[in-house]
Curated annotation (Swiss-Prot):
It catalyses: Endohydrolysis of (1->4)-beta-D-xylosidic linkages in xylans. Thermostable. It comes from the Eukaryota. It holds the Pfam family Glyco_hydro_11. Keywords: Acetylation, Carbohydrate metabolism, Disulfide bond, Glycosidase, Hydrolase, Polysaccharide degradation, Xylan degradation. This is Endo-1,4-beta-xylanase. Its EC number is 3.2.1.8. It comes from Byssochlamys spectabilis. Pathway: Glycan degradation; xylan degradation.
Length: 194
């Protein structure tokens, strides 16, 4: 079975959990900024903990265990409205680079590594406002890691310099684990460190 989709506040942090119901995935809110996901047997899922609303510039510390088998991302992940944008600052990933299908916008040096910038468009896809067409912004770390601090402002500034609109109204901003027809385990703790 799969944990039903939900979102809201838990122990001082905002969480979001979504799956397409196609696999077996369990999402658990642990104390404070910690969550746990076990997944397998197909399907698409994404969940994690963080804040609502997000900020263009927040210092996000994350640490924990991330053990994917197949296509998966560990990212600072969120949405804006006006414009509707889904964004990923990818810190670690499984078998395939998530930005491979996006328009290459060059690289930026942030948080002690080089990140590859990209943009892609999703057509008639699930969003925070139902089925919509919207842009995705990507910043993908080359030196993968499962703990560290992300200065989101570095990435939003880089997207802006590449011509992307970063003036939207923030919805949630979480450190999310995503799986796509894969399996794995993650237990991640997040904190706002300025």
């Amino acid at each position: 079975g799969t944990t039903p989709n939900s979102e809201g506040w838990h122990d001082g942090y905002y969480y979001s959990w979504w799956s397409d119901g196609g696999g077996d995935s369990t999402y658990t809110n642990n104390s404070g900024g910690t969550y746990e996901i076990t997944w397998g047997n197909g399907g698409n899922l994404v969940g994690g903990k963080g804040w609502n609303p997000g900020l263009n510039a927040r210092a996000i510390h994350f640490t924990g265990v991330y053990q994917p088998n197949g296509t998966s991302y560990l990212s600072v992940y969120g949405w804006t409205r006006n414009p509707l944008v889904e964004y990923y600052i990818v810190e670690n990933f499984g078998s395939s680079n998530p930005s491979s299908g996006s328009t290459d916008l060059g690289t930026v040096s942030c948080d002690g590594s080089t990140y590859t910038l990209g943009q892609s468009t999703r057509y008639n896809a699930p969003s925070i406002d139902g089925t919509q067409t919207f842009n995705q912004y990507w910043s993908v770390r080359q030196d993968k890691r499962s703990s560290g601090t992300v200065q989101t402002g570095c990435h939003f500034d880089a997207w802006a310099s590449a011509g992307l609109n970063v003036t939207g109204d923030h919805y949630y901003q979480i450190v999310a684990t995503e799986g796509y027809f894969s399996s794995g385990y993650a237990r991640i703790t997040v904190a706002d460190v300025g």
